[in-house]
């Protein structure tokens, strides 16, 4: 009996000691970061292309970024928002519904905006995904019907924020911080949106959606020599142009602390 008690006590002490061992385990080795050097080339129109082959997964991603200087939209604030909404609604070559159906069929993800585009999907569809992205970006289909729809959506979105203190405060904050004449301080309103016409959107696209300051980054399970041929074929026709480089004075600090109030009905 005495021997059994001694054994039980020893087991109890061992378990208790192990349970109280809260020392931090030794860290494992740091993961190795392997940053591959991209293959780069530039098209005659100024588009800069960076390609990184990564064969770990059968996927590919494309990112088109247009690095233009900021610009003021003035009394037509909202023209860039509407340009973003209209790019990608099909193309002059493919109707909107057919375009979207093919993107879904490929299981791809393609997005467009006023300063570029992005796409991703399975590498076996790499060429077709790039074709669709290039088509939507370079040959946008700007129609009055789609313009009116997107314009109404933008105005409706503003109306839903009219009683949101945080939303209004955020917009007013930019005006106070940068000034209403600075690109970062312009105030979007229903009035400025209504000032925008379809021709304004087309002009905005022609002026700022240009290849001179554009970068196309391609990463995935592709071969550089093959993707280069596709890029040259698809983006070569993009008309060479440079966006205007406007300059603005830097915002100045106020001379003394100010408290600004916005009268909210609620």
Regions found by a protein language model. Give the residues of each.
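M16/MPP (pitrilysin/insulinase) zinc-metallopeptidase core fold and M16-derived inactive scaffolds
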Residues: 63-123, 163, 184-187
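Positively charged n-region of N-terminal signal peptides that target proteins for export
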Residues: 1-4
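Scaffold signal of the M16-like zinc-metallopeptidase fold and its non-catalytic homologs
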Residues: 20-23, 161-210, 231, 264
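Extracytoplasmic
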Residues: 35-38, 44-47, 57-61, 65-67, ...
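Acidic/histidine-enriched alpha-helical segments
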Residues: 100-105, 141-159, 170, 223, ...
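M16/insulysin-pitrilysin zinc metalloprotease superfamily fold
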Residues: 90-93, 121-151
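An aromatic/glycine/proline-enriched structural segment found at the starts
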Residues: 21-28, 186, 215-266
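Hydrophobic h-region of N-terminal signal peptides that target proteins for export
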Residues: 9-18
